[in-house]
Structures are given as structure tokens and as C-alpha cells.
Regions:
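Loop-helix junctions at membrane interfaces
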Residues: 1-172
Length: 172
């Protein structure tokens, strides 16, 4: 039963990240700004670092295969690391039982750190793919916009969900 539960959670996470990346996006210059990171954060917060890694890796990679296949392999690793990192930090935060204001500040630090790793990963990827860091610098703006939007969406969803009993369950 536990394995089926994990498979269902991972399938839902992959689906949410795929939809929020491939469908809920806006073109900014030559880049797509999407809300996938917000759902990676939600999945990683609710279900832990492995669920964040799986949802980030597979959901984002599938979205890239549908929208921008040249970066799909890189996305698999970048978004997986982002989900894993956020999940590890948020698990640490939850286990410390901080006051709500401190928990929010710590979660903000986790979001910013994870987004920074994502932005660095795509900067290095695009420098490699295009052979020039100048071209990769252009994408920093759209990745920054995407990060800010995703952090805002995460906080909206987090604050809506945090009073629901789902957050208080230990068996997830």
C-alpha cells in the first residue's frame, strides 16, 4: 500500500509540474516563463525531497520535450536538483518547529536558494549550448521573472493550504 501511495503522489506531482510548465506559461523574449517551480516547491514541501526531485525532474523534462526539447536532458537534472534541495531544506525547517514568521523567512530562503540553483543551471546550460555566456545572460531576466512569480504562487498556495489538516499529517 505504501508503494502505491508514493506512486500516486509522484504521478500527481509530475502531472502538476508538467501542466504548470507546458500550459501555464508566457513567452518573454526567447524564453518561456512558467509556474512549474511553484508546484515543485509545493510537492517538495508536502511530500518531501524525493517527491520534489521526481516531480521536478520528470514533470519539467516532459514539458520541455513538448515545448523546447533541446534543453530537456539538462532540465531533468536542474529541476530535479531544485526540487530535492527545496525538499531537504523545507524538511529541516518543518522538523525544527519554528515560529510562523521564522518559518516563512526560512522558506523564503529555501525558495531563493533553489531558484538561484535553477538559474545557475540554466545559465551554464545555455552557455554550453550556445557557446557564449553573453547569450545566456539574456535568459537570466526571464528566469528571474519566473522565479519571482513561482515564489509568489508558492506562498499563496502555501498560505491557503497550511491550515488544512493535510499539512499536519505525519504519514505523507
Amino acid at each position: 500500500m505504501k508503494i502505491v501511495h508514493k506512486m500516486v503522489i509522484n504521478a500527481i506531482g509530475i502531472s502538476l509540474v508538467f501542466i504548470s510548465t507546458a500550459i501555464l506559461n508566457v513567452t518573454v523574449g526567447t524564453s518561456l516563463v512558467n509556474l512549474g517551480d511553484a508546484f515543485i516547491f509545493i510537492i517538495a514541501y508536502l511530500f518531501g525531497p524525493i517527491a520534489g526531485l521526481v516531480a521536478g525532474s520528470i514533470g519539467s523534462c516532459l514539458a520541455d520535450l513538448a515545448v523546447f526539447p533541446i534543453t530537456a536532458l539538462y532540465t531533468f537534472f536542474i529541476k530535479g536538483i531544485e526540487g530535492l534541495l527545496f525538499g531537504l531544506i523545507s524538511n529541516y525547517i518543518k522538523n525544527k518547529n519554528y515560529k510562523p514568521i521564522i518559518e516563512n523567512i526560512m522558506l523564503m530562503i529555501a525558495c531563493v536558494t533553489s531558484c538561484f540553483i535553477m538559474m545557475l543551471g540554466y545559465f551554464l546550460t545555455e552557455t554550453f549550448l550556445y557557446g557564449s555566456y553573453q547569450t545566456a545572460v539574456v535568459s537570466i531576466y526571464s528566469n528571474l521573472v519566473q522565479s519571482v512569480l513561482s515564489i509568489i504562487i508558492f506562498y499563496v498556495l502555501y498560505n491557503i493550504l497550511k491550515n488544512i489538516k493535510l499539512f499536519k499529517r505525519k504519514d505523507l
